[in-house]
Amino acid sequence: MKKEIVIIMGYNAAGKSTLVEDFVKKGYKRLNRDVSGGTVDDLAKNADIVLAHGPVVLDNTYPDVKSRASIIAVGKKHNIPVRCLWLKTSFEDAQLNACLRMVRKTGKLLQPEDFKTINDPNLFPPVALFHYRKIFQTPTLKEGFDQIEDVPFIRQWGPEYVNRALILDYDGTLRLSTGAQKYPSAPSEIQMLPNRNGLLKAFAKDAGYMLLGASNQSGIARGSVTAKAVEECFEHTNKMLGMNIEYQYCPHRIPPVSCYCRKPHPGIGALFIEKYKLNPSKCIMVGDMTTDETFAERCGFNYMDAEQFFALKEVPLKWR
């Protein structure tokens, strides 16, 4: 077999592990710091040894020129070509991949405190992706690569992902606050927005949509409201609507970026997708803020602004 060094690079959760499996099946020796430990220079030394027997594939993130240099140097030393496979998975797709992987492996969306104790390189806090984006340097032939190939990301859902849902923001979408704060801190402060019940019932009963809720509740982290009060407000909102909407909420605030559950991050969406095997292209997110729209985009949901959505008289044919 022809000797070569293949560096597979891209965001965490970009799909590198899936791609490297094809190379291993072909007889390539995989070198990965998450498996062997050590530094990139240690991997380079291992590559130096392994190349005596055949081709090598490496699949860590390799975000900058410095992180790739020692591996390329091994190729030059042995006059062996070094090929770069650059996974063009976007930041947003990598975020969703990370959340889906997390839910599939642990059954839940990990919280900031979980990342302090977990020992799995495939389960990482959101700051890892932001750091990669910050330090990333585009690979070039000038570095010493003999070839650079772009690998597009194509998301494919399994045949079990067939269900659809209406995902709803709460504050500003279903209700307003009559209290001193922008968001209700007690059920008595909830004022329902008009024309909500009828359309939601039509989507649920006539068109067969699940009704799910996704909300940011940073007041919990700020200390202006308790988690118990927030949940009482959700339950009272559902009671006023006459519906049992399953809701998930984020209690954290930014900065810092510490969780995947705060919209526009796709964590809550990933949780719903996995739990109910949703087909995102058949789902609709309804909200009133840019964060809601970005959340929908990252999850692959359709999006409608609350004012536009609740102006509908019935479920449109395209969504039946």
Predicted regions and their residues:
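Asp-based, Mg2+/Mn2+-dependent phosphohydrolase catalytic module
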Residues: 157-166, 235-245, 258-285, 289-320
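Conserved beta-strand scaffold positions in the cores of enzyme catalytic domains, especially
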Residues: 28-30, 82-84, 147-150, 247, ...
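ATP-dependent NMP and nucleoside kinases share a basic, alpha-helical "lid"
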Residues: 63-107
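Conserved GTP-binding G-domain of TRAFAC-class P-loop NTPases and closely related GTPase folds
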Residues: 3-9, 89-164, 257-259, 263-271, ...
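Short, acidic loop-to-helix structural element flanking the phosphoryl-transfer center
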Residues: 181-212, 220-235, 261-267
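Asp-based phosphoryl-transfer active-site loop
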Residues: 161-179, 215
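Substrate-recognition/cap helix-loop segment adjacent to the acidic, metal-dependent catalytic center
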Residues: 208-211, 218-255, 272-275
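Conserved substrate/cofactor phosphate-moiety recognition/catalytic segment
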Residues: 6, 11-69
